[in-house]
Structure formats: structure tokens, C-alpha cells
Amino acid sequence: IAIERSRGNSKRILRLNMFVIILKLSITAYFIYGLNADITMIAVASVISQAFLFVMAIHNLCSGNDAFTFSFKSIRFKKNVVNPMLNLSFPVIVEKVAFAMGKTVINSMSKNYGSVTVGALGISNNINGITTQMQNGFQDGGASIISQNRGAGNIKRALGTFWRLVIIEASLGLIMYIILNIFAGPITYLFANSQDGYNVEFQNMIIKVFRYDSLGGCVPLGINAAVMALLFGFGKTKLTLFCNF
């Protein structure tokens, strides 16, 4: 995905991701409703869909004649090549691992309020993720544009891109906050309805958690994504690690 993004093939990334999502949903539906399989087969569906993405990645990586085409002859593990990559990547790796661990700790702490709260928190995070995933897409694209302008010495345009990105991210967060809260009932109904029947208590808990989660997530996280795009574009990954901690 990183190579395709560097090539500027955002449409190819979109097509691949959409196909993987459709493939995973189709296989999962077949396993559950067609074969009446257990929950383990959901993981199998994920493996199959990700395996397809892996095969396509290898194919796209080895095809073409541009600078990003994979070649064993071009592989060099020299310090001037590896060190900058590690210096930029390591803080990002630590940041993402710490973020994942933080979510795990929060979910673990919520066990004191009962299993219903834990489930509601997880579902609320998934619903809120609809907004954050879109914002992350703008973040990735914005970081690339800022980095390109910085490399070309056009700092003014790079900063202009950042301020435009702030407006886009905040506006997107506000719009999605309104939409998701309006349709919170129908969305959460899908999660509160199971083989055991409709659980109104569980749905109300999901909505209650989501109200606060979205209030502190949609717009603020959008602005945060714009700031992260600016820092990534200028190569300040150590600063992003400090800010997120």
C-alpha cells in the first residue's frame, strides 16, 4: 500500500481495499449463513481476503518499469539508506503499538462495569471508526502532498495544504458526527439484534457510550489527523510520538 501510495495510485488502493472488503463479507456470509460454521471461520475469511491482497501486492510490486518496481539488484543495506528509514519509522511503530496497547488497557478497565459495557465500548469504537478511517485517508494524502512541497522547497504551499486539511478534517468530522448521531438508533439496532433476540438494554448502552465517544472523537481526531499529516510531511516522527503519548 505504501508503494502504491508513493506511485500516486490512490484509485488502485481504493479498488483493492474495496474488493478485499467485499470478498471478506461474502466469504464470511457464506461460512455463517451457508455452512452454519462457528466464529473461527470469520478469522479464516479474514486470512483468505488478506492472502488475496498479499498476492496482488507482490504482482503489482514486481510489475512496471518505474523507480518503485522491486528488483533484487537494487537492494542495498547501506547505512545511508537504512538509517533514515529506521529513524523515521521507529517512532511511528512505537506510537502505533502504544496506541493499540492503550485501547486494550481501556477495554480491560471497563470490565469493572460489566460485560455489556465492554461490548458497547467495542462497538462504539467501530462505529466511530467510520469517521476516523475517512479522516486517516485525508491524513495520508495530505502528508504526501506536504512532503512533496517541502522537498521542492515550497514551504508556503506545504503550510497552505495543512490549513486546508484542518478545515476539511474538521468539517468531515462535524458532518459525520451529525449523521452518525441521527442514525445511531438504526445502526446500533444491527448490533443489538442477535439469535437470542433484540436486546434494548444493550442498544441503549451502545448509544450512550457512542454519544460521548463521538463527541470527543469526530472533530478533535480530525484536527489531530491534520496536525499529524503536517508533522509526517516534515519528517517530525519523533515529535508525533511525543504528542500522542
Per-range role (PLM):
Residues 1, 15, 197-227:
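Alpha-helical transmembrane segments of multi-pass membrane proteins
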Residues 1-13, 120-184, 221-235, 239-243:
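Small-residue-rich hydrophobic transmembrane alpha-helices
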Residues 3, 7, 18-26, 47-55, ...:
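Hydrophobic alpha-helical transmembrane bundles that constitute the permease/transmembrane domains
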Residues 4, 9, 19, 31, ...:
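Hydrophobic/aromatic residues within transmembrane alpha-helices of membrane transport systems
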Residues 11, 21-55, 186, 238:
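Membrane-interface helix-loop junctions in multi-pass transport and translocation proteins
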Residues 39-44, 80-88, 109-129, 161, ...:
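Interfacial/gating helices of multi-pass transporter permease domains
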Residues 43-46, 55-99:
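Interhelical loop/hinge segments that connect adjacent transmembrane helices in multipass membrane
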Residues 175-200:
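Short membrane-interface helical motifs at transmembrane helix boundaries
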